[in-house]
Amino acid sequence: SVTSQIQVVQFNANWNSANGVDWLNKLSDCKINQVDIAVDKAAQTKYQIIVVPTIVVFNNGEEIKRFQANIMMQMESKLEDIQNLVDETVMESF
């Protein structure tokens, strides 16, 4: 299905959990994953995560956009920003 092709991944670290994005589970039409870069350093390197949290949206394994936290390690992007991107990506696949 189209939904399974779109993946939203939050990269964060356990020492920054207070700034984690807790609304990701409200997204629809996509798969959601969490990666703790304090534990999975290989993922941090592979995806070049320089600030946490970082939310990366993938379509068929290809990164289409990333949303990065500000200098205070807080995510300024909102649920709507990411849902709109997911919705656009779903529509483009038809």
Language-model features: locations:
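Soluble periplasmic/extracytoplasmic beta-strand elements of cell-envelope proteins
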Residues: 7-10, 54-56, 66
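A short acidic, amphipathic alpha-helical/loop segment
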Residues: 21-23, 43-46
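Local sequence-structure signature of Cys/Sec-based thiol-disulfide redox active-site neighborhoods
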Residues: 1-31
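Extracytoplasmic/periplasmic, Sec-exported soluble proteins
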Residues: 35-36, 47, 74-78
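Structural micro-motif
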Residues: 47-58
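Generic anion/oxyanion-binding catalytic loop in active/binding sites
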Residues: 33, 44, 71
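N-terminal post-signal-peptidase region of extra-cytosolic proteins
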Residues: 37-42
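Non-catalytic, surface beta->alpha helical segment in thiol-disulfide oxidoreductase systems
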Residues: 57-94
